[in-house]
Amino acid sequence: MISRYLRWQVLGSFMGKLLFAERDGVQVLKLIGDVRVTLGPTISTFLTRLGESKTFKSIIIDLTETQGIDSTSLGLLAKISLTTQETFGTIPTIISPNEDITRILESMGFDKVFVILKELVTECGQLGELNTEIVSESKLRKQVLDAHRVLMSLNERNRGEFQDLVQALEHERVGEPAEQRDRVA
């Protein structure tokens, strides 16, 4: 299904980068390196495009080269799963050979919203590079807030873990001018 002919696009940052490939409705999102909040806008744009896809059949999130991943990025991945299930009626797959990362995924409840496998069956093709998206601080704050709300919705452990952060971010948003809050999608 996924072959060496897949077209890759790189969505990157200084610490980590995202690679994307699509073929015959199968979309692959590969996270490389240390994936942090700075990649949030890029993941959000991917999520928007995914929801608008007319050819979507399935998605694979490849963590084979992921060294670290923060909670904002995890929340956005969870949002990809929930959106995919809601919009297309399919459960995404995560490839995670790193036991430490797999343990984090399972503790966050990802085993309830993803199929988690240890290896990708075939290699994907040539890589091409794209720029990382830069967004305003208020938009980034909203993405962090939304990502953590999604994580909180997965299980009670997450709710307890991220409740203080979400409340702090909500409090910061209250202090923003209304036109700035309303502008943030």
Where are these regions (language model features)?
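STAS-like cytosolic regulatory interaction modules
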Residues: I2-E65, L82-A185
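Residues immediately C-terminal
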Residues: G68
